[in-house]
UniProtKB/Swiss-Prot annotation:
Protein name stated in the entry: Ribosome biogenesis protein Nop10
Originating organism: Methanosphaera stadtmanae (strain ATCC 43021 / DSM 3091 / JCM 11832 / MCB-3)
GO cellular component annotations of the record: ribonucleoprotein complex
HAMAP family linked to this entry: Nop10
GO function terms (MF aspect): snoRNA binding
InterPro entries for the chain: H/ACA_rnp_Nop10, H/ACA_rnp_Nop10_sf, Nop10_arc-typ
SUPFAM superfamilies in the record: Nop10-like SnoRNP (SSF144210)
Length: 55
């Protein structure tokens, strides 16, 4: 089992659980994705960024 620090988006409580023990809302992982030089989704990110800049 892999434990990752998680944070509730509603109340800001930190936990290791999938849902917040205080307000029972689904929590999110607070760490960014691991860096890889072989960026699989870089092409799509650049396309999206270019589209947003054109607006």
């Amino acid at each position: 089992m892999k434990f990752q620090m998680r944070k509730c988006k509603e109340c800001g409580e930190y936990t290791l659980e999938e849902s917040c023990p205080e307000c029972n809302v689904k929590t999110g992982v607070i760490f960014p994705a691991r860096y890889s030089p072989q960026d699989k989704y870089g092409k799509y990110r650049r396309i999206l960024k270019r589209q947003q800049m054109e607006k």
